Amino acid sequence: MSSRFFYGGGSDSDSSSSDEEELYSDREEEEKSEEEESSEEEDETSEEEESDEETGAKKFLKDVASDSEEEEEEEKVTVVKSAKDKRLDELENTIKLIENAKKINDWAVISTEFDKLNRQVAKITQSGPTPKIYIKTVADLEDFVNETVAKQKSGDKKLNASQAKGFNAAKQRIKKNNKDYANLINKYRKDKEDFMESDDEEATPVIAAPRITKLERIEAPAAAIDDDGFATVGRGGKTLQYTPESILKHLRVIVESRGKKNTDRMEQIRTMEKLLEVAQTPYQRIRVYLTLISTRFDLTSTSSANYMAVDQWKSAEQDFSSLLSVLENNRDHVVSEGAEEWEDDEKQPTIAPGETLYIPGSIVSFAERLDDELTRSLQHIDPHTAEYIERLSDEKLLYTDLVRAQAYVEGLNEAEKTDPRQDSVNRVVMRRLEHVYFKPSQVITILEDATWKALPSELDSSITPRASSGNVENLVLSLCNYLFKYSDGIIRARAMLCQIYFLALHDQYYRSRDLMLMSHLTENISNFDVSTQILFNRTLVQIGLCAFRSGLIYEAQNTLSEVCGSGRQKELLAQGIIMQRYSTVSPEQERLERQRQLPFHMHINLELLECIYLTSSMFLEVPLMAQTSSSPEMKRRVISKTFRRMLDYNERQVFTGPAENTRDGVIMSAKFLAAGDWKKAAEMLNSIKIWDLMPQPDKIKEMLSQQIQEEGLRTYLFTYAPFYDSLSIATLSNMFELSEKKISAIISRMISHEELAAALDQVNNAIVFRKGVELSRLQSQIVTLADKSMNLLEANEKTLEQRTQGMANAFQRDQGAGARGGRGSGRGGQARGGPRFPGGQQGRRPGGQQFGGGALGGAIKA
């Protein structure tokens, strides 16, 4: 059937306008070569005439040497090649390149040069027969392809990825091309030498086409175009026809123009949208959708913005959904990443009953790209506007596509289980898990219900069946267990972290903690990529928040200290970039850092995180400071340097006003608790409004009040234990409004941990303190003074050694030569045989003031 890809006025030829242009260019080249030959002849004749006209001294000055030069010039013959000979030379050069590539098995070069060879032969055959050297080359290439296939099947020689790609492309093209020269190839294979030596070449008839000017090509009568397809007259008079037969040719042109400059991608998108309207077969629609979605994604690389436009993203999502619908309705068409490309644009592949047609492409890559573009768009939108909420609603469409893509690749993997297909299933399951692990159960339930309602009723998933979509915990557990079983490396580690995060978010502290410990991720997390390390930090923080909600203050503070103690919460959680004044970060590193930032709806509230960390530190630090006030040996123990620094800064203030923010509220509460006023401490801590952001805020405030009562009791006992001989438990119960049973339990724990030197008298219901175990205030001050004196002595001796440059005879206190009472230069003495200085000065260094060792040196000299 004649192609309507191009239409030229005044010509009924079935060839495309591109072939006509090549024909015209060939004729123009011949004309130019003829003109060059004629101009060269004219130049030669003019030179001869000028030489004949030479008269006078010039003519008679020529000697024998000049005659010999003329003979040499006559021997030099200028060879002028015709256009046909030049093309044959180019053909031979191309064949040499193919032969060299065959020796090193470079199929990429063979494929490229084979296409070039065919273009050169097409020009030669327009004015003559097919060259025999071309027949020899294509026949030998086909034999070489068959040998390579046999070696691959036997396992003798395996090709790498790039070689296999070039080999598959070359094999299809050679097979298709050799069909047109089957008779000549058979003659060559029967007797190769006779075929190459014979001169009886059948000249192919050449039809002399009349010269067609550009004016005639521009005229394209619209009445001559059939109405079975669209027709558009483009620039230069080229008629673009959109018919089912020309779809593959259009797609070929679009694919070859990818990555080139000055390519109008919007025009290509409009072209493919028209091709969709005329597409008739599932194969045509699938090919158009695959190219159309890729072209929409290419728009991002040329735009000034770093993210995809909203309208183009929605169009790409609709095209992706339509592509999945076509694939679900036509199970004999499969989009696979390792499939071979169909090279014949003139006809479409035919599918026999029971066979499957594999089309090159990747469904999972499209789903991942849609996910990445949505995330990138959310990163660039102000989260405090309605636009962000509206854009976030598109996540439901994306999640539906992810579930649909998962069901599709599951079916392919079950039909034929291979490593690439298993990897595709793992990738799409991981993407789905990353969209649900940080959400509360209620939100996931709503999302799952809406997703399964939007999908066709006959569609189901074997990993997460439609019937079990109501149980959120089983959903996350099924996704994670599947990845634990079939994946490894980064995907497996990320699945583990997502499950731990989900359990911690839903107040299952002990399960999440045990999973984190058993995974051993804390030991080797530095070996993973940056995004996985960010997920690890988020999971660690969520475990700490879960421990705090459960009332486990020590576990919460210990877990959060690694992230919150550094002061770089924003960076570690990928929730912002801290721009330092003298940073050496390159623009490329900054760009990558911004790409890793999480969208706002995935953020953990940093103010709430800081409040919980400071509150946990307060409950541990205030009793510790009271305990170390009477125990100098415990002075250096610090649990939270951040909290201590803030508390010291607040105490240095001359005037302290009311608490203005969350941090001030926690510090004021700590000061009340240290002073023994636990009621004011509880009132101040509960007045912080950020607790309302947590689930069940009343329960949290009740837990905080109870914790303040217990830590207030411990602080009181640490502070006033040296002043009591015994203390009634009933008195403590009235003072801190705790039950006597609770107070007895707290005191018993303190005694067992050796924090309190006392005994519990259950008969009298009192605490009996042991004297002489702990130091008194006076004894503590004496020990402190002794420590400072020893530090001063060590500092002076170190300074003295530096000033005397390590001389061994400076202030020696041991017995030996030169020591006090020995022979030599002791105090007031002089070494025997040593040099004498005037005035009796022994060894005084000239210049400067002699170091005397300060107060300690004076004491030694005395």
UniProtKB/Swiss-Prot annotation:
Pfam families xref list: eIF-3c_N, PCI
Cell compartment(s), UniProt: Cytoplasm
PCI domain span: 600-774
Keywords: Cytoplasm, Initiation factor, Protein biosynthesis
One CC-aspect GO term: eukaryotic translation initiation factor 3 complex, eIF3e
A GO biological process held by the record: formation of cytoplasmic translation initiation complex
PROSITE patterns: PCI
Residue intervals passing through the bilayer: none
Primary role: Component of the eukaryotic translation initiation factor 3 (eIF-3) complex, which is involved in protein synthesis of a specialized repertoire of mRNAs and, together with other initiation factors, stimulates binding of mRNA and methionyl-tRNAi to the 40S ribosome. The eIF-3 complex specifically targets and initiates translation of a subset of mRNAs involved in cell proliferation.
Family: Belongs to the eIF-3 subunit C family.
Quaternary data: Component of the eukaryotic translation initiation factor 3 (eIF-3) complex.
Protein name, per record: Eukaryotic translation initiation factor 3 subunit C
Organism: Neosartorya fischeri (strain ATCC 1020 / DSM 3700 / CBS 544.65 / FGSC A1164 / JCM 1740 / NRRL 181 / WB 181)
Gene behind this protein: nip1
